[in-house]
Amino acid sequence: MQNSEFKYLIRVSRTDLDGNKKLIMALQDIYGVGEAMARAIVRVAKLDPNKLAGYLTEEEVKKIEEVLADPAKFGIPSWMFNRRKDYVTGEDKHVIESDLMIIKQEDINRLKRIRCYRGIRHELGLPCRGQRTKSTFRRGPTVGVSRRKK
């Protein structure tokens, strides 16, 4: 394919990416990066989206990490970020990996602490978004119906 050395694992922002996958698919293995964000990163970094991730050079990996660190600086619109109008700072940012997991858990704990509807539903392990619970979200083993004796 290319003259450069093929690598089976590529380390991008604390995540090992599969070198056999196409670049857009490999970037989606990073927690917090979906298909739209992966396409935007590849477009902004001026990389071939069909290129296998194993053929990335060190410079290209650094460019991807720079875009992931501050996507707004590279012209990615704020509506693509996963943390708009942050509760603490009020700024738009895109958070990935363990930072996203921590922030997500802090948000849930804040909802529980202020005892809002969503927080209470989280505490009880029930759905927060209005789904019906008569037949779904049940816990425990299924109990069969016993027949009456004749």
UniProtKB/Swiss-Prot annotation:
GO terms for biological process: translation. Pfam families: Ribosomal_S13 (PF00416). InterPro entries: Rbsml_uS13_C (IPR027437), Ribosomal_uS13 (IPR001892), Ribosomal_uS13-like_H2TH (IPR010979), Ribosomal_uS13_archaeal (IPR019977), Ribosomal_uS13_CS (IPR018269). The keyword Electron transport does not apply. The keyword rRNA-binding applies. Keywords: Ribonucleoprotein, Ribosomal protein, RNA-binding, rRNA-binding. GO terms for molecular function: rRNA binding; structural constituent of ribosome. GO terms for cellular component: cytosol; small ribosomal subunit. Residues 131-150 are annotated as: Disordered. PROSITE patterns: RIBOSOMAL_S13_1, RIBOSOMAL_S13_2. Gene3D superfamilies: 1.10.8.50, 30s ribosomal protein s13, domain 2 (4.10.910.10). Part of the 30S ribosomal subunit. Forms a loose heterodimer with protein S19. Forms two bridges to the 50S subunit in the 70S ribosome. Belongs to the universal ribosomal protein uS13 family. Located at the top of the head of the 30S subunit, it contacts several helices of the 16S rRNA. In the 70S ribosome it contacts the 23S rRNA (bridge B1a) and protein L5 of the 50S subunit (bridge B1b), connecting the 2 subunits; these bridges are implicated in subunit movement. This is Small ribosomal subunit protein uS13. It comes from Methanocaldococcus jannaschii (strain ATCC 43067 / DSM 2661 / JAL-1 / JCM 10045 / NBRC 100440). The lineage of its organism: Archaea, Methanobacteriati, Methanobacteriota, Methanomada group, Methanococci.
